[in-house]
């Protein structure tokens, strides 16, 4: 595990402990379960939205709403989540990914609420999930999917978090970087496997990470390539290998209009 990831996970444990004191687990769980049947906040079907795009022969883009990152600093000083989400929806995104980590990515729960309310797209809570509390919290905020990072979790906890998400009607995107992590991810039932092309130890990025893992990927999984998709040639390279789902953030966040950049990149 990288030093930065260890640091983030330590902070997450502290955040969860503090959140539990502010609002106990039964309260969060009750809100999450109530939201499941709410006409506005009920789950929108994240995995199905990706399948629909791919089935129509198009790239399935998970468009990220991200103000900053630890490695790149502030990406978008004029950060308006609702406006960004609306632009993504207008220009063909399949889903949203919204950063809710405050300390390292300058995200916030309100950004998830605002982005999701601004359009009809399903939304991923992009954060470092280490506790069941966060899963209930995600659904209480309206999240349709959570991220599980294999390198951050032991197998038992990862399975427990996945089961909780599915019980609440959410999908799960499980993230890997190498063959060992993929083997662990495939023990879960989720069809969504994200391959992070960025090495969290060195921060080097190569699309060969996704391409190298494809031969080990079962046909029933949807591969989501993450990080390093910066130009149309990157998209063509992935689609030529039958990778049709993409999580893109930085390229969009640095553009004047994120949705227009999405349309250009995936034209």
Swiss-Prot record:
Q: Which residues cross the membrane?
A: none
Q: Please cite one Gene Ontology biological process associated with this protein.
A: L-tryptophan biosynthetic process
| Pfam families (UniProt xref) | IGPS
Give the main EC class.
lyase
- The gene behind this protein is trpC1
Q: Which domain of life is it from?
A: Bacteria
EC number per UniProt: 4.1.1.48
| Catalytic activity from the UniProt record | 1-(2-carboxyphenylamino)-1-deoxy-D-ribulose 5-phosphate + H(+) = (1S,2R)-1-C-(indol-3-yl)glycerol 3-phosphate + CO2 + H2O
Q: In which pathway does it act?
A: Amino-acid biosynthesis; L-tryptophan biosynthesis; L-tryptophan from chorismate: step 4/5
Q: Which UniProt keywords apply?
A: Amino-acid biosynthesis, Aromatic amino acid biosynthesis, Decarboxylase, Lyase, Tryptophan biosynthesis
The protein's name is Indole-3-glycerol phosphate synthase 1
Starting at the broadest rank, the lineage of the source organism is: Bacteria, Pseudomonadati, Pseudomonadota, Betaproteobacteria, Burkholderiales
Family as reported in the entry's similarity comment: Belongs to the TrpC family.
Q: What would be an example GO MF term here?
A: indole-3-glycerol-phosphate synthase activity
């Amino acid at each position: 595990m990288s030093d930065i990831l260890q640091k983030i996970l330590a902070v997450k444990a502290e955040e969860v402990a503090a959140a539990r004191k502010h609002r106990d687990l039964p309260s969060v769980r009750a809100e999450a379960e109530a939201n499941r049947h709410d006409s506005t906040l009920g789950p929108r079907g994240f995995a199905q939205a990706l399948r629909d795009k791919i089935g129509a022969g198009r790239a399935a883009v998970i468009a990220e709403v991200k103000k900053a990152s630890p490695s790149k600093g502030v990406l978008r000083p004029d950060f308006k989540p609702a406006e960004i989400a609306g632009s993504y929806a207008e220009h063909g995104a399949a889903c949203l990914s919204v950063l809710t980590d405050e300390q390292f990515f300058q995200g916030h729960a309100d950004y998830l609420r605002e982005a999701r309310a601004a359009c009809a797209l399903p939304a991923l809570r992009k954060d470092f999930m280490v506790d069941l509390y966060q899963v209930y919290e995600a659904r209480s905020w309206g999240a349709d999917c959570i991220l599980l990072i294999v390198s951050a979790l032991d197998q038992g906890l990862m399975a427990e978090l996945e089961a909780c998400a599915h019980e609440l009607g959410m999908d799960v995107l499980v993230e890997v970087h190498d063959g060992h992590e993929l083997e662990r991810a495939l023990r879960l039932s989720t069809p969504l496997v994200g391959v992070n092309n960025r090495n969290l130890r060195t921060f080097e990025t190569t699309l060969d990470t996704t391409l190298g893992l494809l031969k080990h990927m079962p046909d029933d999984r949807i591969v989501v390539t993450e990080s390093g998709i910066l130009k149309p040639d990157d998209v063509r390279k992935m689609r030529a290998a039958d990778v049709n789902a993409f999580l893109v953030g930085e390229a969009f966040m640095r553009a004047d209009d994120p949705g227009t950049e999405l349309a250009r990149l995936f034209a």
